[in-house]
Design a protein with these regions (language model features):
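Small/flexible residues
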Residues: 10-12, 18, 42
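Bacterial N-terminal signal peptides
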Residues: 17-28
Length: 330
C-alpha cells in the first residue's frame, strides 16, 4: 500500500474515533430527561440504617403523602457513621438536585452542618441540638437548618433514678466519638458532683472493648448510665446482659432499652419524630423560609420503668416514681 493510501486510512480512522468520542461525551454530559428534571427530590441521610432511624423514616414517609406524590421522590442514603462518608452523602444529595436534605441522628446532622449545603436541611432524633451548636439558643434555627429535638433532658431521668436508688457510685458508659454522649456525660457529671456522687466515666469505642471496660466497674457501683450513641445501639443487648448478671441497674435514653432489660428509660417517640419532620418538610415545600421555622420540641416523651428488672435487683420503686411512669414493663 502506498504512503498516500496509508495516510488516508489513518486519517479516516482518527476522524471516526474522534466522532465516536464526541458522541459518547455528549451523551455522558447531557442533562437529565425532562421528567427527571421536573421531579422534586428529598434526600435522606442516616448512619448505618439503624432500626430506630428506620422507624422515624417510616413515619416520615407516611406523612409526606400530602405534598410528595407522583412528581416527588425520596432518595435514601445509609453511609457508614464516619464523618467523611456522611459529608460525601451530603454532597451527593446536593449534586442530585435535592430540594430538601433530611438527616437522622447527630452524626449525619453535624456532617450537613459542616458542609453548609445550599438547600434546606431538616433533622430528627438529635440530642439537644442547642447544646451541640446545631441551632442557636435564641432563634432555635441553624444556618439553613431546622428540625425536631430528639430527646428529653437527661437530668429528669437521673432524678427519677436517684429518688429510687441510694447512689454513691455511678458509672457512665460513653462513646468518645458520639457528640451527644459527651454532652450527656458532662451534664451527669455536674449533677453527680452537686449530689456528692462519685462518677466512673467508662469510655468505649470499638465493639471488642465493651467487655474490658465493663470489667472495670467497681463491685459496689450503684448504677450505670448508657449514653446515647449510634455505636451503643448494636451493643445494647450485650451490655444489659452483663450488668443485669452483676445486679447493676442501668438507665439510658436509648429508645426501647427498657424492653431489653434496662431499669429506667426516658425516650421520645419515633412516630412523633417522623410526623413532625414531615410537617416541617411540607412547610418548606410550600415555600416557607426554613430560617423562619424554629426547631420543634417533642411532646410524646415516655418514662418507662422495668419492674421485672427491679424485682430481680431487689429494688423497691416508690409509688411516687411509678405514678409518673408512662409505661411499666412487668
Amino acid at each position: 500500500m502506498c504512503l498516500a493510501s496509508i495516510d488516508r486510512v489513518r486519517g479516516d480512522f482518527v476522524w471516526r474515533f474522534l466522532l465516536s468520542t464526541l458522541i459518547i461525551m455528549s451523551c455522558s454530559f447531557s442533562g437529565p430527561s425532562q421528567a427527571v428534571a421536573d421531579e422534586r427530590l428529598i434526600a435522606v441521610i442516616m448512619a448505618n440504617s439503624q432500626p430506630r432511624y428506620n422507624q422515624v423514616h417510616a413515619a416520615f414517609v407516611k406523612n409526606t403523602e400530602g405534598f410528595c406524590d407522583t412528581d416527588c421522590r425520596i432518595y435514601v442514603q445509609t453511609p457508614n457513621a464516619d464523618t467523611m462518608s456522611l459529608r460525601n452523602s451530603v454532597r451527593k444529595a446536593v449534586a442530585l438536585g435535592a430540594e430538601i436534605i433530611v438527616t437522622y441522628g447527630p452524626l449525619a446532622t453535624l456532617a450537613a452542618k459542616a458542609e453548609l449545603p445550599p438547600v434546606p436541611t431538616i433533622f430528627a432524633d438529635v440530642y439537644d441540638p442547642v447544646g451541640l451548636n446545631i441551632v442557636s439558643a435564641s432563634t432555635k434555627t441553624g444556618r439553613n437548618m431546622s428540625g425536631i429535638r430528639g430527646d428529653a433532658p437527661v437530668q429528669g431521668l437521673f432524678k427519677y433514678f436517684t429518688d429510687t436508688v441510694t447512689v454513691r457510685k455511678f458509672a457512665i458508659l460513653f462513646d468518645m466519638h458520639s457528640p451527644e454522649a459527651l454532652l450527656q456525660k458532662r451534664i451527669l457529671e455536674e449533677s453527680s458532683k452537686r449530689k456528692g456522687i462519685t462518677v466512673y466515666a467508662m469510655e468505649v469505642g470499638e465493639a471488642h472493648n465493651y467487655f474490658a471496660q465493663l470489667g472495670k466497674l467497681p463491685d459496689d457501683v450503684d448504677g450505670v448510665f448508657i449514653a446515647s450513641s449510634e455505636q451503643h445501639e448494636s451493643q445494647l443487648s450485650f451490655v444489659l446482659g452483663y450488668t443485669n448478671a452483676r445486679k447493676i441497674p442501668v438507665i439510658t435514653q436509648l429508645a426501647g432499652a427498657a424492653d431489653e432489660g434496662a431499669f429506667m428509660v426516658l425516650e421520645t417517640s419515633a412516630q412523633e419524630q417522623g410526623e413532625k419532620l414531615a410537617e416541617i418538610a411540607g412547610q418548606v415545600f410550600s415555600g416557607q423560609n426554613i430560617n423562619q421555622l424554629p426547631m420543634l420540641k417533642p411532646h410524646s416523651i415516655a418514662f418507662v420503668v422495668n419492674l421485672s428488672v427491679a424485682k430481680e435487683l431487689s429494688i423497691k420503686v416508690p409509688i411516687q416514681t411509678l405514678s409518673v411512669a408512662s409505661r411499666v414493663v412487668r
